[in-house]
């Protein structure tokens, strides 16, 4: 892109060519024949095509070279690096250009949670890996993934190998993870953030009023906690939503402080006092309050390693390098498989394969797993805030049919709420992370009216004909009348009734109990276990162990991941679309605005009934 701009500037600076009058030529002597013009044009097309082909081959060879496994040997004395700034995802990335940065024309690593957990487990008994070094400025993992990887590092310590952490600056989540280390170090001129947890909601009502956009909200009266629609008709949190969010951040902060308290032997009361008084900002203050052990530069950390833990011949081993060095897991019988299916993203109607859950596409994957005789049990990793009620029900049906044939265990990620919980309900067991956002058993509809705003600001008007009184219902030009509103509410109430009944059936709970804990309320994983929406708290490995036990597979089984692959040009175009969005997200303020615009687009962009939870850790700090 930069080269193109420079080239355009150079061309612009050149003086305009002086027109030259052609010399008179005798008839029949012209050298500019049709054949030559056609040949030149054809040659230009061919050369241009070859240049593009070479460019794409270069890109794919770069990506391919990066993705080759087993090419870099592991040193005999290595220290495994966990770089918290590198992305770790729930599900394998679907696009063929994953890890390729078009701004720098280079590749960056992206790892899956399951592979990282497998690598840390392998490192326990790998004599070449002497310890773990935690570092990185930034955060490439969600809090739920942080918790699972942190637990794996805690287990790694049982091997007797060392774990140390060093950061220039500590964010709250970085410290939550790094507190697992035997020794924690900070840069002498770094900083420390310890402030507690807060959550913020953006409200659009004032903007909509100024624009003249009216929004009809369809929400059952009992769904008072279903707050996804509140930004469209309120200017601040409702009392119910405020209570819900306060409960969430309290539970989240409680998990952070209890974990740090245990790791650093500091009372929860003292940790809260530090946050209330902003006592820890400077490195010296972090040492004084026993959050870190010492201030060290990177070279001093290296010297410490070679003095106390390893020899000077050691080498760092990147996590992606170590994952690539591990042989594919081929142990266990190929005829006794535990399949991992990923349900990652917002739930939408139809078919597709990007960063959303398409109802028909996931349903087809579930059907394939159900009819595969080699698959004896299924773990579904759900990381979804919900979405389309219809798509959720399509997936639910296939999950129910699957559960009737073989054990199904849900592993909840960052969130498995609303529609995400809807599709989880039929499972034999539900495993939630302690900080999973789940529940949100409720429903709503939203119908924006933009006609008056378009006329006021742009002079656009609408007119038409119809055969019946309500033939133009839902087109967005006029608000719903009383009859139309009642008709829409019948559909909303029907979805809520079905949602609560299938949860009662799937979780073996009285309907009255489900109605009491539903109302659209969001629960943390620990709370979900207490009220019966989850069976236990744990990660994906816990879910796998439960699935193995329910299928009575013993030790002779194999883990397989069932993925939806996209091939050819469609995959490339989807990838480029994802890349463009990621560039926006790379700037925090722009990223937050983009997230808010995406929410508006989801609901205002098309009329419908939704089972959706508005919260994610991107809005919780």
Write out the residue ranges for each language-model feature.
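N-terminal Lys/Arg-rich, disordered targeting/topogenic segments
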Residues: 1-41
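Hydrophobic alpha-helical transmembrane signal-anchor segments
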Residues: 34-69, 77
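Membrane-proximal juxtamembrane linkers immediately C-terminal to transmembrane helices
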Residues: 69-79, 332-333
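Cleft-lining beta-strand/loop regions that shape enzyme active-site pockets
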Residues: 80-201, 330-453
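Charged, glycine-interspersed solvent-exposed loop segments at helix/strand-loop junctions
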Residues: 201, 205-304, 451-531, 535-550, ...
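C-terminal long alpha-helix characteristic of the crotonase
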Residues: 262-263, 293-337, 444, 500-506, ...
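Intrinsic disorder and flexible/low-complexity segments
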Residues: 333-338, 342-374, 491, 563-621
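Active-site proximal loops enriched in glycine and acidic residues that flank catalytic Cys/His/Asp
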Residues: 342-345, 382-384, 412-414, 427, ...
């Amino acid at each position: 892109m930069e080269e193109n701009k420079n080239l355009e500037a150079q061309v612009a600076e050149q003086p305009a060519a002086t027109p030259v009058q052609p010399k008179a030529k005798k008839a029949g002597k012209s050298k500019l024949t049709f054949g030559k013009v056609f040949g030149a044009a054809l040659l230009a097309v061919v050369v241009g095509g070859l240049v593009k082909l070479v460019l794409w081959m270069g890109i794919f060879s770069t990506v391919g070279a990066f993705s080759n496994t087993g090419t870099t040997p592991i040193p005999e004395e290595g220290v495994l690096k966990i770089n918290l700034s590198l992305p770790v995802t729930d599900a394998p990335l679907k696009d063929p250009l994953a890890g390729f940065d078009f701004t720098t024309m280079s590749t960056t690593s992206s790892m899956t949670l399951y592979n990282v957990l497998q690598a840390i487990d392998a490192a326990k008994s790998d004599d070449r890996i002497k310890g773990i070094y935690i570092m990185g400025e930034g955060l490439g993992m969600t809090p739920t993934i942080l918790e699972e990887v942190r637990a794996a590092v805690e287990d790694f310590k049982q091997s007797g190998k060392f774990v140390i952490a060093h950061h220039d600056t500590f964010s709250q989540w970085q410290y939550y993870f790094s507190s697992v280390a035997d020794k924690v170090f900070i840069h002498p001129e770094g900083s420390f953030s310890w402030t507690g947890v807060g959550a913020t909601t953006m409200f659009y009502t004032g903007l909509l009023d100024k624009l003249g956009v009216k929004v009809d909200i369809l929400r059952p009266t009992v769904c008072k906690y279903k707050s996804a629609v509140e930004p469209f008709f309120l200017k601040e949190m409702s009392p119910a939503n405020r209570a819900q969010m306060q409960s969430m951040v309290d539970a989240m902060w409680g998990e952070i402080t209890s974990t740090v308290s245990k790791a650093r032997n500091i009372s929860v009361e003292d940790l809260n006092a530090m946050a209330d008084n902003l006592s820890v900002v400077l490195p010296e203050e972090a040492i004084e309050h026993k959050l870190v052990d010492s201030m060290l530069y990177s070279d001093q950390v290296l010297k410490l390693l070679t003095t106390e833990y390893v020899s000077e011949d050691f080498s760092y081993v990147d996590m992606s390098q170590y994952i690539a060095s591990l042989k594919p897991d081929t142990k266990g019988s190929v005829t006794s498989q535990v399949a991992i299916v990923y349900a990652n993203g917002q739930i939408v109607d139809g078919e597709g394969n990007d960063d959303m859950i398409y109802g028909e596409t996931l349903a087809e994957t579930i059907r394939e797993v159900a009819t595969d005789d080699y698959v004896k049990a299924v773990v579904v990793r759900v990381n979804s805030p919900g979405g389309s009620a219809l798509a959720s029900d399509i997936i639910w049906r296939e999950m129910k049919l699957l559960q009737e044939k073989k054990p199904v265990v849900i592993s909840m990620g960052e969130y498995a709420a609303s529609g995400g919980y809807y599709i989880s309900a039929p499972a034999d067991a539900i495993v939630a992370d302690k900080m999973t956002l789940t529940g949100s058993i409720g429903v709503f509809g939203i119908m924006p009216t933009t006609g008056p705003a378009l006329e006021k600001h742009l002079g656009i008007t609408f007119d038409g004909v119809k055969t019946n009184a309500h033939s133009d219902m839902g087109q967005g030009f006029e608000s719903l009348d009383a009859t139309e509103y009642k008709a829409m509410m019948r559909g909303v109430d029907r979805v809520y009734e079905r949602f609560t009944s299938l949860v009662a059936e799937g979780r073996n709970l009285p309907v009255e109990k489900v109605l009491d804990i539903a109302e659209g309320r969001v629960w943390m994983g620990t709370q979900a276990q207490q009220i019966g929406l989850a069976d236990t708290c744990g990660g994906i490995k816990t879910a796998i162990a439960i699935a193995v036990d329910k299928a009575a597979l013993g030790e002779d089984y194999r883990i397989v991941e069932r993925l939806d692959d996209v091939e050819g040009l469609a995959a490339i175009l989807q990838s480029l679309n994802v890349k463009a969005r990621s560039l926006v997200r790379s700037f925090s303020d722009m990223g937050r605005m983009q997230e808010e615009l995406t929410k508006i687009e989801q609901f205002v962009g098309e009329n419908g009934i939704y089972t959706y939870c508005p919260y994610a850790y991107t809005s919780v700090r």
